């Protein structure tokens, strides 16, 4: 009994972590009860459903209307990615509608030549609310472009426009010194998609000046609606939506342009609550990971799961020079294959933008890595005691009942992996339905799926399954390090070393990009290559999580099949959730 008590204790503690993280995030999104967040569905003129979160301060009534703001996210994102704007604006007396653009999040897919990407429908909805007075718009990246398109196609008056990391490089083609009203441009100093000197030059005409625009200087005035300003906070494209300077400056601008002066609801812009929302997501996601690890540990004690429970094999381990050299090679191969597929124009289309290039890149990298592993095995056969497939966490031959044993092991691994995914989804759905909250806030992990998006999961699963299997053979097979004296120290050592070697190349690239950008005062690698590097910020935490599952699966069963199936489901869920859909 004493042997299983820690498993249940960790399981209970992880559930408490999830509950506390959800409570923190909900408290921030609802400003501790003074704001009501509601999930709503709109419809564009083309009949596409738009998913949104409406945050209404309880003080907003027909008798005391408050300004309304539409907030729109960037590409390969969803409304949660810009929720920090909604949180800080709503608690300061703004009615905020944050939407999933067409083809993104839980909104309907982009079909044909749809002109309304959700902005017009959202603006019309807010304009029709009796407790909303004036209107403003905030758009990040692609969302900035949608906001501009919306203003060009609607007659609804908008008194303030905030463009974050997008829409401003060609402003002279759609704006002048007075139209649109009160424009605020926010571009990260290290934004990979902008050349700052070129941007400041291009803003001269709409800012009504003949010289390059000076960051932080107010041009025009709010009384006539001609106010313009640009700021360059020290951040990159991806993190503009959670950068404190971006958030604070945006709230200040909208307060001045839509309210005129601070009112009874105003809170100093430096007093930010959204970090509590981010912390809640981190805590709940960490609890989710721990809960599945504990769940696997509990379930494997029972029939029929315990048939695959075995102590880990310690006969083979990779020495440090081999671990580093081959680990780096494995990481480089994977990255080269991924970026090669991203940069190549495929001769056919796929409904989820970038889905096929990413999956094929991962598959190609896995295939090359597997062929390399076979070559290494063949070379090592000449040595005295080469590692067997069994030593690497694979299977011990197909003779003498080997096929039956392999099928049984794979079946149980699949079932446990599926149970783990179902367990997580059973947490995600009620949080989304009853709290109007995304379980993982803005993190690229554990997002509720629309029925259409759910259809993509099995398609990705079968393509990613060989990738996660090969990853197991490398990370917890060929590159598995020497065990230590105590099991918990060994597990910690295995997990940390596995994560280190898995993300080393990606972390190094991001480190160089960050440091060099800081040194030169702008993005070191810019353009689309710089944009694609932002994907590494998604892959690193996901690989850290998947590698943790690999190490624990090996601990439980001397195999990594539980994690192979679970990780294939997990990455399929991730891709189905975040990639745009264009039909």
Residue spans for each PLM region:
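P-loop NTPase catalytic cores that bind/hydrolyze ATP
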Residues: 241-255, 281-297
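Alpha-helical transmembrane segments of multi-pass membrane proteins
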Residues: 21-25, 293-297, 334-341
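Soluble extramembrane regions of membrane proteins in the secretory/endomembrane system
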Residues: 32-272
């Amino acid at each position: 009994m004493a042997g299983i008590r820690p498993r249940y204790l960790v399981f209970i503690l992880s559930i408490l972590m999830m509950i506390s993280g959800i409570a923190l995030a909900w408290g921030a999104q609802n400003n501790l009860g003074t704001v009501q967040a509601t999930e709503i569905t709109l419809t564009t003129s083309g009949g596409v459903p738009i998913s949104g979160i409406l945050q209404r301060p309880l003080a907003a009534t027909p008798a005391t209307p408050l300004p309304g703001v539409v907030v729109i996210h960037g590409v390969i994102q969803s409304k949660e990615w810009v929720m920090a704007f909604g949180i800080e604006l709503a608690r300061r007396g703004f009615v905020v509608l944050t939407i999933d653009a067409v083809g993104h999040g839980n909104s309907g897919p982009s079909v044909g030549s749809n002109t309304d990407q959700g902005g017009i429908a959202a603006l019309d909805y807010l304009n029709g609310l009796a407790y909303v007075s004036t209107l403003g718009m905030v758009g990040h990246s692609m969302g900035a472009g949608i906001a501009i398109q919306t203003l060009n196609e609607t007659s609804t008056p908008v008194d303030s426009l905030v463009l974050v990391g997008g829409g401003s490089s060609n402003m002279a083609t759609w704006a002048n010194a007075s139209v649109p009203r009160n424009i605020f441009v926010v571009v990260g100093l290290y934004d990979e998609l902008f050349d700052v000197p070129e941007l400041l030059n291009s803003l001269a005409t709409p800012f009504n000046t003949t010289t390059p625009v000076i960051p932080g200087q107010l041009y025009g005035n709010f009384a006539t609606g001609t106010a313009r300003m640009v700021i360059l906070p020290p951040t990159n494209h991806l993190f503009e939506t959670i950068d404190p300077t971006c958030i604070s400056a945006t709230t200040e601008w909208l307060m001045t342009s839509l309210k005129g002066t601070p009112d009874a609801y105003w809170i100093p812009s430096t007093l930010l609550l959204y970090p509590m929302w981010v912390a809640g997501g981190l805590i709940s996601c960490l609890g989710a990971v721990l809960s599945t690890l504990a769940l696997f540990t509990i379930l494997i004690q029972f029939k029929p799961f315990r048939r695959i429970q075995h102590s880990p094999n310690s006969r083979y381990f990779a020495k440090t020079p081999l671990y580093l050299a081959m680990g780096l090679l494995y990481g480089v191969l994977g990255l080269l294959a991924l970026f090669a597929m991203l940069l190549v124009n495929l001769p056919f289309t796929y409904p989820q933008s970038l889905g096929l290039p990413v999956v094929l890149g991962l598959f190609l990298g896995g295939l090359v890595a597997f062929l390399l592993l076979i070559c290494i095995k063949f070379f090592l056969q000449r040595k005295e005691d080469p590692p067997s497939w069994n030593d690497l966490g694979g299977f011990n031959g197909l003779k003498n009942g080997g096929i039956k044993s392999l099928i049984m092991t794979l079946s149980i691994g699949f079932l446990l992996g599926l149970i783990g995914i179902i367990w997580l989804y059973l947490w995600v759905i009620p949080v989304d339905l009853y709290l109007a909250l995304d379980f993982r806030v803005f993190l690229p992990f554990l997002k509720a799926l629309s029925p259409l998006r759910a259809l993509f999961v099995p398609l990705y699963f079968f393509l990613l399954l060989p990738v996660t299997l090969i990853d197991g053979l490398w990370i917890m097979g060929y590159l598995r390090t020497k065990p230590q004296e105590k099991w918990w120290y060994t597990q910690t050592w295995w997990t940390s070393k596995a994560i280190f070697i898995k993300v080393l190349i990606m972390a190094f690239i991001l480190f160089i990009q960050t440091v060099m950008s800081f040194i030169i005062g702008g993005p070191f690698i810019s353009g689309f290559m710089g944009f694609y590097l932002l994907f590494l910020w998604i892959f690193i935490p996901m690989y850290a999580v998947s590698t943790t599952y690999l190490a624990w699966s090996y601990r439980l069963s001397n195999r990594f099949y539980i994690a192979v199936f679970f990780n294939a489901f997990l990455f399929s869920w991730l891709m189905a959730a975040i990639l745009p859909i264009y039909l």
